[in-house]
């Protein structure tokens, strides 16, 4: 999933910058009510999938599509860009959280 984009970026990277460092961020939530825990992360995912970048140039929307969620990614983006953020959040599938 990440190999080709990273290789393409490294090929364009100025060698004077030194080696490329990667940072991975994750969400962690502990509790018995998994649905509630999912709901805590929905606003963040909806923002990234729906609102980060232009409609035709959103890395996170493209990533959700490559993960196998093209319909959900389209719905989330349509709702988010229409200002219907709560509906966009509700449209994030649990498997994407």
Task: Name every feature range the model reports, one short phrase each.
Residues 1-97:
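Active-site-adjacent structural elements that line small-molecule/cofactor binding pockets in enzymes
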């Amino acid at each position: 999933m990440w190999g080709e984009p990273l290789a393409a970026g490294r090929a364009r990277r100025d060698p004077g910058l030194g080696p490329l460092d990667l940072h991975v961020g994750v969400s962690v939530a502990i509790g018995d009510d998994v649905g509630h825990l999912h709901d805590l992360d929905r606003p963040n995912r909806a923002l990234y999938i729906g609102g980060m970048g232009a409609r035709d140039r959103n890395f996170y929307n493209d990533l959700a599509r490559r993960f196998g969620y093209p319909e959900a990614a389209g719905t989330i983006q349509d709702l988010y860009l229409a200002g219907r953020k709560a509906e966009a959040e509700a449209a994030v599938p649990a498997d994407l959280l």
